[in-house]
């Protein structure tokens, strides 16, 4: 019998399908190839050859082209393969669950013994699919099948695909098949970034550390995948009709397809053999009649030439590696066995340091001299509290006489661990790492720490932290990526390290974000690159990411002479060697490189409790009795004390301590500070004032005009309208319109417009506009929306020109195209040119058939400008008042700069409240005197000119420091961030940048801000 054979070689798996003459599946096979594509192909073809000697063959899949070229076999692009399968097979919608165990290579046998369900069910209703949604290991697609084929595919980012689910399962410490089981038990959905899988991971990790339930996290992960697919791929086209779900994640995780159904408000289905549609399409397209055993021999004989750029091997030979190991064994923390220490009754007191990190938890004990007595390094597996509890229980069991006289926590879980176990204090992790490095190398002048999700670089000057570099919201380029890739290879990190060390020609993957290197990795796989060379290339890339993307150095050798590298990632000899080769110098790696945060915390506990008498009568902070009585419980709350409506997890411990997470301010915790001081800090927050000042324009019973002659007209409260609302509201009200302003954004606003977003790369504030339009049309039933295009902003004479950025200026046109059934007024106007402005508006209002005349428009323009100038004057006056009052009360001031629309709570994620809650006054760029300054870039954008002006103002005020909010995806901020940094650094001021996007958890933001404050306070210096 002549059969049709299709191979689908994807990013993580290989699949094979054999069809009979009637296109029925008579054989199928599936397993992970672990990047060994040729070996996997030989394996799977051998199994086929056992049953079928010849057949028509074609190959598809993201990693299949190299093999197709080797065999001179037809390659079918996977989209067309999927389309051919959809067209060539009859699809029946049934309740049958087609389950496949991905961990087994032997597939279930049909009665005919051919390896498949020969008698496929055709019960149920036959359907014609309208849309196919396919999720693979690192690929995602939506095929719109009606009205001609339209395909949407993910780019190089693997966010929202099977590999992301793999990462999340690993992060939660569960098997991937448990995701579905846990998701079905969920009671709460956490808002998680949907733009990118790594961003979602950055949201999830702090939730894991803060004790969120795994069941809720599991479903939240699936929701994030749905959001990524709809927002990132559909890009404004509505998903409707008969939906077919394809690919591994949608096959193996029924809860994922259920989440799609929930969000799309429809009922899709997973067809039989959904996992094999690409392979089936390839089989249908097969044109080469082949002998299978000939193909196997051809693969064995073919060697792939190196077609990629290579780097120097990490180690030329065993001798070089031995010298490397010997050199790095010289710098050590002094150690002593804990049992030996406790055998001397004079040495009962120890100090505990806990580093509750993003993926691991580290604990150390030291004596009063800083000698390391005990250590533990382990994955936190989603429960840091239980990890610490188990460590302490085992400690007391092994050493009943031990007394813990002081304790300190650091890392993501700093506050959680400190409260759970009555520790004396917490310390921001950057400061903890500095303390530890200084203990080993007193003259240290630069520290590089690469952990699971965080990258910290500290510049040390005169014995104190002088500058801080942290990776942004994205955790790519850190240890977690290497860990994930090792998992994909089926090896642990020790084996991964060995593979990289034995590389002879590491592949050059550049210094891009490592998630975006997937395309390069796939290409290397197609070319037959060895796993060793890919592993070594990734080690180089992590190093380059630190040097050129985080530190942003142009000369690696200029960082310093006494460099300490630390963090779990540097436990890898391969990463360390790549760093030394790239730097062209030798560095110091402590023998406890992965424990430096915990060790620094223990040193700080020692300093914090320095007045304790070290004798046998000293009172420990934790006892064995305390641990026996230890318990905690958690509950989910929604805080309604401000517009953020934070989703709170409240954890109460047996020691009467409570821990709140998810809150962006201290309002929910009335006991945190006294009410008078809290009220003062609220008054010293310009962002609170901005929202209150603009609230007078919100649409409500008091602020409506139902008898307006010209009816309702809507304004979206976002982008170019945010600061201009006083003008437009007054202007249109004066023309006798009932002006409806959409409310302040929240998560629901984003979800309302999510399906209309045409690009996943546009900034988050622009994405929110779609939701504001839906609110105006669906909730307020506004018949007309006024959303003008403003090429120019108000001219404040502080720049060479006064443009708005292209998104701010012209997004109204995108909105109009996305909402063809709504009536939009989108005039191109210049608020600086009254004559042309009024004439243009007159022509625009003619579309509404009003009798508004030009003189009325001119009067309304004057009234609007008066209103706008009053608002801007009020902001400046309030800013001056905040600065004056903060100085009177000796409160530090933060200049939190960005764009006017960064005042939106859903955009800034509560960062102003967070800074205020840390005891600082908050002002913004609108609060400072306007002044044109010299810049190193073309200064032609109004919003950006204000940033430069604010930075210059900060350089002239010692008690004010700047923090810049940047929306991810903002192209112009690639320029402004460098210029703002340059202005500040000329005056020896620290620059702090906060990347904000759909991310909702502020754990990383809090660490960055506290690091700034620690450096400013001189909290950690050589004198400590």
Please state what every model-predicted region is.
Residues 3, 154, 159-164, 475-482, ...:
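An N-terminal assembly and electron-transfer interface module characteristic of large anaerobic redox
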Residues 84-87, 162-170, 272-305, 435, ...:
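Glycine-rich phosphate-binding/hydrolytic loop that grips phosphoryl groups
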């Amino acid at each position: 019998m002549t059969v049709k054979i299709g191979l689908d070689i994807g990013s993580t798996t290989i699949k094979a399908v054999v069809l009979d003459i009637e296109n029925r599946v008579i054989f199928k096979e599936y397993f992970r190839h672990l990047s060994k594509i040729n070996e996997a192909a030989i394996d799977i073809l051998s199994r086929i050859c056992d049953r079928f000697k010849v057949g028509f063959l074609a190959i598809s899949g993201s990693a299949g082209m190299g093999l197709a070229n080797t065999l001179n076999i037809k390659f079918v692009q996977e989209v067309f393969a999927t389309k051919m399968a959809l067209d060539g097979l009859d699809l029946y919608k049934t309740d049958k669950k087609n389950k496949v165990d991905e961990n087994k290579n032997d597939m279930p046998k049909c009665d005919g013994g051919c390896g498949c369900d020969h008698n496929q069910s055709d019960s149920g209703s036959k359907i014609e699919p309208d849309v196919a949604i396919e999720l693979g290991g690192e690929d995602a697609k939506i095929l719109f099948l009606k009205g001609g084929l339209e395909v949407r595919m993910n780019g190089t980012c693997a966010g929202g695909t099977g590999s992301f689910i793999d990462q999340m399962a690993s992060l939660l410490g569960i098997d991937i098949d448990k995701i579905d089981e846990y998701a079905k038990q969920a009671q709460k959905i956490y808002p998680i970034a949907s733009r990118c899988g790594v961003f979602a991971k950055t949201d999830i990790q702090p939730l894991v550390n803060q004790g969120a339930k795994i069941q809720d996290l599991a479903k939240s992960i699936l929701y994030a995948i749905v959001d990524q697919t709809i927002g990132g791929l559909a890009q404004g086209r509505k998903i409707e009709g008969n939906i077919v779900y394809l690919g591994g994640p949608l096959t193996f995780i029924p809860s994922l397809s259920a989440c799609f159904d929930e969000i799309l408000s429809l009922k899709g289905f997973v067809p039989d053999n959904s996992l094999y549609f690409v392979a089936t399409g390839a089989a249908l397209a097969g044109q080469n009649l082949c002998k299978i055993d000939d193909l196997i021999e051809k693969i064995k004989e073919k060697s792939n030439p190196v077609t990629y750029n290579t780097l120097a091997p990490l180690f030329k030979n065993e001798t070089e590696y031995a010298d490397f190991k010997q050199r790095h064994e010289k710098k050590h923390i002094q150690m002593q066995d804990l049992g030996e220490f406790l055998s001397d009754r004079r040495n009962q007191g120890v100090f505990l340091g806990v580093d509750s990190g993003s993926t691991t938890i580290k604990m150390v004990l030291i004596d009063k001299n800083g000698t390391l007595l005990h250590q533990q390094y382990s994955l936190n597996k989603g429960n840091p509290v239980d990890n610490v509890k188990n460590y302490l229980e085992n400690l007391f069991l092994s050493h009943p006489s031990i007394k813990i006289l002081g304790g300190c926590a650091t890392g993501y879980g700093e506050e959680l661990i400190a409260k759970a176990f009555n520790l004396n204090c917490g310390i921001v992790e950057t400061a903890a790492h500095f303390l530890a490095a200084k203990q080993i190398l007193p003259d240290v002048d630069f520290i590089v720490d690469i952990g699971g999700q965080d990258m910290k670089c500290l510049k040390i000057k005169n014995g104190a932290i002088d500058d801080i570099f942290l990776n942004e919201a994205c955790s790519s380029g850190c240890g977690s990526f290497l860990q994930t890739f090792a998992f994909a290879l089926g090896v642990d990190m020790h084996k991964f390290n060995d593979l990289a060390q034995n590389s002879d020609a590491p592949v050059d993957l550049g210094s891009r974000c490592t998630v975006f290197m997937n395309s390069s990795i796939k290409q290397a796989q197609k070319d037959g690159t060895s796993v060793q060379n890919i592993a070594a290339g990734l080690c180089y890339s992590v190093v380059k990411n630190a040097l050129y993307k985080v530190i942003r150095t142009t000369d690696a050798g200029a960082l310093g002479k006494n460099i300490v590298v630390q963090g779990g990632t540097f436990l890898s000899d391969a990463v360390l060697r790549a760093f030394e080769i790239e730097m062209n110098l030798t560095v110091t790696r402590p023998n406890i490189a992965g424990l430096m945060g915990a060790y620094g915390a223990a040193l700080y506990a020692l300093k914090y409790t320095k007045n304790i008498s070290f004798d046998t009568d000293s009172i420990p902070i934790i006892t064995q009795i305390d641990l026996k009585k230890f318990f905690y419980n958690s509950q989910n709350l929604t805080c309604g004390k401000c517009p953020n409506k934070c989703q709170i997890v409240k954890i109460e411990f047996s020691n009467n301590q409570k821990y709140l997470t998810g809150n962006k301010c201290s309002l929910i915790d009335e006991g945190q500070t006294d009410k008078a001081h809290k009220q003062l800090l609220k008054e010293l927050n310009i962002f609170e004032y901005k929202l209150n000042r603009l609230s007078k324009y919100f649409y409500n019973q008091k602020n409506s005009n139902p008898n307006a002659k010209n009816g309702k007209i809507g304004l979206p409260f976002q982008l170019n309208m945010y600061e201009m609302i006083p003008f437009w509201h007054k202007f249109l009200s004066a023309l006798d319109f009932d002006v409806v302003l959409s409310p302040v954004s929240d998560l629901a606003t984003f979800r309302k417009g999510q399906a209309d977003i045409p690009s996943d790369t546009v900034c988050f504030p622009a994405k929110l506009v779609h939701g504001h339009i839906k609110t105006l049309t669906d909730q307020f039933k506004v018949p007309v929306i006024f959303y003008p295009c403003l090429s120019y902003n108000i001219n404040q004479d502080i720049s060479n020109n006064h443009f708005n950025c292209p998104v701010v200026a012209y997004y109204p046109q995108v909105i109009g195209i996305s909402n063809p059934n709504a009536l939009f007024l989108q005039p191109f106007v210049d608020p600086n040119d009254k004559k042309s402005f009024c004439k243009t508006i007159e022509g625009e209002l003619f579309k509404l058939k009003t009798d508004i005349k030009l003189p009325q428009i001119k009067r309304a323009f004057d009234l609007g400008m008066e209103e706008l100038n009053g608002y801007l004057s009020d902001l400046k006056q309030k800013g001056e008042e905040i600065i004056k009052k903060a100085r009177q009360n000796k409160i530090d001031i933060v200049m939190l700069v960005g764009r006017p629309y960064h005042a939106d709570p859903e955009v800034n994620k509560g960062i102003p409240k967070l800074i205020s809650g840390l005891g600082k006054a908050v002002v913004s760029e609108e609060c400072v005197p306007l002044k044109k300054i010299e810049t190193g870039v073309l200064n032609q954008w109004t919003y950006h000119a204000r940033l430069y002006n604010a930075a210059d103002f900060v350089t002239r005020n010692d008690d004010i420091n700047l923090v810049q909010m940047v929306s991810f995806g903002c192209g112009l901020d690639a320029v402004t961030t460098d210029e703002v940094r340059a202005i500040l650094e000329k005056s020896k001021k620290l620059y702090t940048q906060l990347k904000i996007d759909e991310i909702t958890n502020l754990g990383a933001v809090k660490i960055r801000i506290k690091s700034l404050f620690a450096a400013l306070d001189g909290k950690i210096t050589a004198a400590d």
